[in-house]
Amino acid sequence: MWLVTFFLLYSLRKAHTEDVGTSLYFVNDSIQQVTFSSTVGVVIPCPAAGSPSAVLRWYLATGDDIYDVPHIRHVHANGTLQLYPFSPSAFNSFIHDNDYFCTAENSAGKIRSPNIRVKAVFREPYTVRVEDQRSMRGNVAVFKCLIPSSVQEYVSVVSWEKDTVSIIPENRFFITSYGGLYISDVQKEDALSTYRCITKHKYSGETRQSNGARLSVSDADPAESIPTMLDSFQSREVRAGRLVELPCIASGYPNPAIRWLKDGRPLPADGRWAKRITGLSIADLRVEDSGTYICEVTNTFGSAEVTGTLTVIDPLRVTLTPKKLKTGIGSTVILSCALSGSPEYVIRWYRNTDLVVVDDFISIRGISNETLLITAAQKSHSGAYQCFATRKSQTAQDFSIITLEDGTPRIVSSFSEKVVNPGEQFSLMCAAKGAPPPTVTWALDDEPIPRDNGHRTNQYTMSDGTTVSHMNVTSPQIKDGGVYRCTARNSVGSAEYQARINVRGPPSIRAMKNITAVAGRDTFINCRVIGYPYYSIKWYKDSLLLPDNHRQVVFENGTLKLMDVQKGMDEGEYLCSVLIQPQLSISQSVHVTVKVPPLIQPFEFPPASIGQLLYIPCVVSSGDMPIHITWRKDGHVILSGSGVTIESKEFMSSLQISSVSLKHNGNYTCIASNAAATVSRERQLIVRVPPRFVVQPNNQDGIYGKAGVLNCSVDGYPPPKVMWKHAKGSGNPQQYHPIPLTGRIQILPNSSLLIRHVLEEDIGYYLCQASNGVGTDISKSMFLTVKIPAMITSHPNTTIAIKGQSKELNCTARGERPIIIRWEKGDTVIDPDRNMRYAIATKDNGDEVISTLKLKPADRGDSVFFSCHAINSYGEDRGLIQLTVQEPPDPPELEIREVKARSMNLRWTQRFDGNSIITGFDIEYKNKSDSWDFKQSTRNISPTINQANIVDLHPASVYSIRMYSFNKIGRSEPSKELTISTEEAAPDGPPMDVTLQPMTSQSIQVTWKAPKKELQNGVIRGYQIGYRENSPGSNGQYSIVEMKATGDSEVYTLDNLKKFAQYGVVVQAFNRAGTGPSSSEINATTLEDVPSQPPENVRAISITSDVAVISWSEPPRSTLNGVLKGYRVIFWSLYMDGEWGEMQNITTTRERVELRGMEKFTNYSVQVLAYTQAGDGVRSSVLYIQTKEDIPGPPAGIKAVPSSASSVVVSWLPPAKPNGIIRKYTIFCSSPGSGQPAPSEYETSPDQLFYRIAHLNRGQQYMLWVAAVTSAGRGNISEKVTIEPAGKAPAKIISFGGTVTTPWMKDVRLPCNSVGEPVPAIKWTKDSEDSAIPVTVDGHRLIQANGTLVLRSVKAEDSGYYTCTATNTWGFDTIIINLLVQVPPDQPRLTVSKTSASSITLAWIPGDNGGSSIRGFVLQYSVDNSEEWKDVFISSSERSFKLESLKCGTWYKVKLAAKNSVGAGRISEIIEAKTHGREPSFSKDQHLFTHINSTHARLNLQGWSSGGCPITAIVLEYRPKGNWGWQSLRTNSSGEVFLTELREATWYELRMKACNSAGCGNESTQFATLDYDGSTIPPIKSAQGEGDDVKKLFTIACPIILATLGVALLFIIRKKRKEKRLKRLRDAKSLAEMLISKNNRSFDTPVKGPPQGPRLHIDIPRVQLLIEDKEGIKQLGDDKATIPVTDTEFSQAVNPQSFCTGVSLHHPALIQNTGPLIDMSDIRPGTNPVSRKSVKSAHSTRNRYSSQWTLTKCQASTPARTLTSDWRTVGSQHGITVTESDSYSASLSQDTDKGRNSMVSTESASSTYEELARAYEHAKLEEQLQHAKFEITECFISDSSSDQMTTGTTDNADSMTSMSTPSEPGICRFTASPPKPQDSERGKSVAVPIPHRASKSDYCNLPLYVKSDAFFRKPDSHEPCPVVPPREASIRSLARGYHPPARHLTLDPAAKPPGLPPPSSSSSSTTLPQRTLPMPTAASTAPAPAPAPAAPAEPPANTTTTTTTHSKVGGSRDSLLEMSTSGAGRAQKQGAGAYSKSYTLV
């Protein structure tokens, strides 16, 4: 129940929540003033708006509507007010200088904006001035920009100039916020400049430049003086939150100190207060900052002070609450207006933009009228209310939307009828809405419900005004049943709802009270029955069953409704009868009485005029008596004394007014009431009033041209109509004529007449006449007199005077006398008594006055605006006269823009043109040493030109130059003389002896000699080599490269050229001045290269089952890169199991080839490439083709077994070569002795591989064979088997054994179908190391009923030999299945073989292929500091790749992963390599500055060296020394750069930054500009200022602090590293102990003698291959990457007598990111994916060409030491082994990057004599190596068991490593580079391992270097090859077999080569020999190890083959650390191998 109630309430809230939301708003109510230029106009958007769209209107502040004035004012449809540009004569103050406001109105109400002051500003001519100032050295100077007061409000200072250069506020120059210029610490040179201010008009945008003012600086030492105020303030008024600057600056000597006081007290400590040289600055002003401020300046000779007042104005803010209100009629509304800000304000209230008038309903309360109260609100009170607060010029407002609606309650949610059990609580909910919120009451059967414990009510009001009431009945009884009614009431009305609630129990009827009904209304009578159930409720009246007429309705719940009750008809007894049983009823009666309500007859008020008698009766025509009649006016009781008399009778009441007046207007209501009801009737009384004058017209004066209002205001009802008439003339009016209303003359809303522009013709009488049809019309006349204000009628706008001559200015005025004429010059009134140069004469001329101003004589200062002002009592007018005084011009300011070798560029600025147009310029120049009599000149230069070039000068010469300017008045004085020096010239001769030599397919070497000495014109700085391709189709444009000069002969190599293309080359020399002529073009052709694109249109067509035709077309000629030699077709087969066949290739010169001998019905991949003399080109995309079908080969195997006495079962294997799709199998059965001529034939489906043949004869032999059938026909038959049926059927397996290969994570089925009688039992076992383990059935393994073993989601550990044994009473049978699980390939070994500026060449060696051919490689690379990797997909045959288009000088990260049919394998270690190049550097030998004058500097940036990478940008920053701010200049050119607008005679700091892709280089220097006269300035002197001590302290303290931090950081780092070393040592010991425990495990064949020691693998960087020098070994303790492990430390952890311990070999320069101490990342999981989970991901290992080395030191004292390059192979039992995980060599990089020890890998890694000699010298320093012998050998073991190893030669070895002839005698060379593209055996040498398809003879064809008597007994020709488990090999056999390439170099200090000690007999057959053995020579006396016993020739089929001695070379499953200690008894898995390189020290 409660849950239901909650959902009802929630739905109610959602359904009735109404958003009152304000639909009116202000876009911007802060607009309160708009000033605009008369020449521009203005557009003012309406600040108010509404949603939905509101009607926008504009009004004047007086409330008058505004109207459109064509071309003057217009209101757009969107509410925008536009004032158009206008001339001064069209100015109208009503339009252009008035207050406006805008309103927005929609259904929500109407709001108005604050008043907006709109003011137009005229474009007045004005001048700004700066006066000359005086100051002492070291003091302060203040310049002020003097702006005329008439425009001061609109004009502001925007900048200052010093000698036409804008002043940047810094150092000694400061610009105040109000436009003053302060110069502190005045220097002598400050007097050499002129200072100007620049102003800007805020509204017109017009700028003005002042005159140039000068500063006079006293030459003498400063004189002692008291302080004098230079700038101060008096009062400021600023808004809060802004910044203010109070100026206070004074001069004096000594410099005065400044102290500030506020209200007589020192300034408080506040960060907002800042004392500056310009004064006191206060930020974020607050009201409390207001006060009186005193600035005191004091020195030793006196003091001065200035006092000013600061007033902070807090802006007014108004908040009106509530913002929106929706309530009901009759409620009370309270609006509160809260203000913040200034306390002085006035509040006004508006409703819908009208001022609120206080009446009976509305009152305004509060001290400041801040509260508006509305009582008994009516519908008319709805609307928008605004609270306006005004203080002086500030106005703020806020508004609220009030919505009043009919508040009569209504039920919005209720309950329904229900039946409840006694004691079962229930709750009833009733929700009502109204305004004000109603109150809900409850009744049961028309009686109030008592409040007790059983009945509880709960009522609350929701946020939307809904009242919710609950009636909760906790334990209902029968009496609680009945009709429940909820009634909602408020002051407006009521509403109710009822429904029956039945409580189960015996029915009964409550006593019913008599009912009084109102006639004409509906009445409900409830039958107050309680209890439930009952059958029916019926009503009777006068024994008649109701209803008996249409006005009666009986509802199902027993309620009787009487509609339109009638007296008499509906009165009487009503009986309610309730049928409670079929024959039993109960009843109760009720009496109904009908009362008739009053009925008022209609009445109306007749039209009434003031003073009339009025009588209105109110008659009640019907209704039960008694009836009470009353009257009300406007809802209030009519009081006595109001002039209204009321007379009442029994059924009538009359209202009588003896004399009607205006106060009687209103709504009158007659109310009649009796016992039945109260009724009323309302009518309105309107009193008509004749017109009367409120304001009578009176005679008045109008001013010509101004607006005039003729006042006339009338009142009356209906509102009177006013008409204005006019009678011209000043005499008695004869006749009045109606005045036509125009745009100039209009009638205002108050009836007054508005004349917008009063004219003289408006003189006359005006009549105001009003009428409204009541009484007689009224009228009143008045006389208008027009007064003429003073007006200027004539004056010249502009005039010209000549300097030194007299000039007269005339001005004529008219208007009402007297007229006064005043002359002003600028803003100053001219007084001839004080200034004798001026004279004023005035005379009358009729109705005009003429005034003349005479200047005697005119000078330059008179070039201003003169104004004559005419003034009388009615106005003032002004005439502006611009006087221009002309004179000869000032000399121009000349500057040298650019000086070249043979020319110079001049620029000049004309300072003052003499107020006459400049007509030309003259330039004169001469040699510095000559007099001006020998000058050269250029005359009459056009005045429109401000710069010129002087040519034909001599390089490196000194010239003097000056200028004149002239106008029509005369010629100026000469300008200041400048001195310049010309520069060097570019070379005039080309380089000599240019030759070209092609170097590669993309490079040409260019050689040449310098130009002749006499043509160099300076020092040759470098050369530009231009080259272009001369082949057809090239654009013929030269590409330019640049290099520095190195001597008389030069060499340069052009790279990145097109291959096999002809190029033309030219060379040019350049010096500082430029580039000389180029040499003659010489041509050369680049060398050939391989084709860069494959052949096109490659097609393949299958001709027969073993023949296919491949065709193609020639690649594009442009991609051949040479002479095409032929084509090579590469193809390989794709087997059904997903593996690839052997790759083959065919070479041809034709464009078609026929491939024969292909496998039948086989998919082939085909690629075609073209080759040139340079090698093979790019292969084409792989093309797939399938050969056609042929007849199949014989089935691969056949079995036949007896299944009963008369039947046999034959099974077979599919053909090894099906040559097509097998359609069926045919089984042949023949009996040789039966005499049947033909065998019987049986056919089966292709998916059935066995068949039962029945009905055979017992004891008779039968011969069986099988043939497969394809679409090509029947194939070859299988081997024939003989069988005879037998009664006893022993267990036989008809399935076949063999090898099953599958990818991991797949389900595999191993079949073992058997026959026999009885049915055989099946048992599966799996071979382990020492026994066969039964296969258990679990979730992973399942044995089906037919004997099939199902392995689900196979893993690598599921690989192995599975044996199925079938057994019954008569025998058993066994098959063996070898399961090989393919896994993703192992990680490749990635190395860097070569780098260049834009490329990195990578090489790699693939890892274990996981049992599946490698399909390709994925190479990823990224920039070192980026994690965005790019992918490159590479063919599986590639072993190297060149990354091109890389950034120069950039580190790159590279990683590689291989992919096979299973998926992608482990990612290689991330290696890093850097392309060639470095950041730019600046050569100290280069001259940076080529020219410096007083304002410019020219820089030569050719001194920047690119570092091998092109420079992308050069940034120059410079500043005057001592300044903080830098000016910057950016360029991409390395040529010349100009620094302009420098200060003269100033030292500058310059810093440069040049950047390329490798980084940025920096360079800094200083330079000084020249003085204004061209002289140099002295060096910088160290002058200690205020901040010097702080700077020195900072300079000293910083290094100390940094050093202290560095020491502390070093201490922490060393402590951390020490902890890491200890942890690594513990890890090393733990690993050693673990290896000991593994080593102590027992095997099948225990090793005799001491076990081999564990090998500790420690990750350190790759360094030199041989031995560290003594100094390096001593530094092991300082290694920061790997802890040194000593013999003593290892002896504590392990038994020194039982195995060897590991010692790390270090290099002092180590990188720190080479991995942890024990790095297991190189442990190859082989085919075991589980083991990979414990190995770190390759992504976590990042090596900068680092390698892992392990030094295993045996405790046994032997002189032999072996350095092996692969720690995964078995090490020697005697000696120290250093292992290397990478297969390439490296040396320390020459790169100097910090933190990077990168290694440069070469394509071939070999040791030279020099390296061995150095190692020999190092060995002599070590006591342990005094008698050392160096042996260097190499050994290779294939990592594949492919068919390539069956050839018996090394030619087909895996191409990842190739053996080559040593480059030097005695040194075995190792090459890690991939095969070259043109290698003829490339197809054979590609490392694509083929899955093993072994037969017995596979191991007979192993290469010589794999065979060994120790493992295999040589088979005789008649003896089969011994069966050996696959993937087993002997280290000894490898060493023995691979002896031909082995070489030795013996370096013995004693010249006595010791041999190897002979092994003991006890260990000769069990101890593994050294990994590499030297060739038997005279120098080697060590005997060969004794051979091990031979293996048995033919082990039994059901036993495991073992060997006496063998070693695991490269396990694919077990740990490699385990492998090194495995000893004998471990079976080597197929395909394992090792690649290694070793160096042996004996």
From Swiss-Prot:
Residue ranges, annotated region (Disordered): 1716-1742, 1781-1805, 1841-1865, 1940-2042
Residues linked to a glycan: 28, 78, 369, 472, 514, 557, 667, 711, 750, 797, 810, 927, 1083, 1145, 1163, 1276, 1346, 1493, 1532, 1562
Protein name: Cell adhesion molecule DSCAML1
Side Extracellular, residues: 18-1592
Native organism: Gallus gallus (Chicken)
Keyword Cell membrane set for record: yes
Function: Cell adhesion molecule that plays a role in neuronal self-avoidance. Promotes repulsion between specific neuronal processes of either the same cell or the same subtype of cells. Adhesion molecule that promotes lamina-specific synaptic connections in the retina: expressed in specific subsets of interneurons and retinal ganglion cells (RGCs) and promotes synaptic connectivity via homophilic interactions.
SMART domains reported for this sequence: FN3 (SM00060), IG (SM00409), IGc2 (SM00408), IGv (SM00406)
A Pfam family it matches: FN3_DSCAM-DSCAML_C
Membrane topology field: Single-pass type I membrane protein
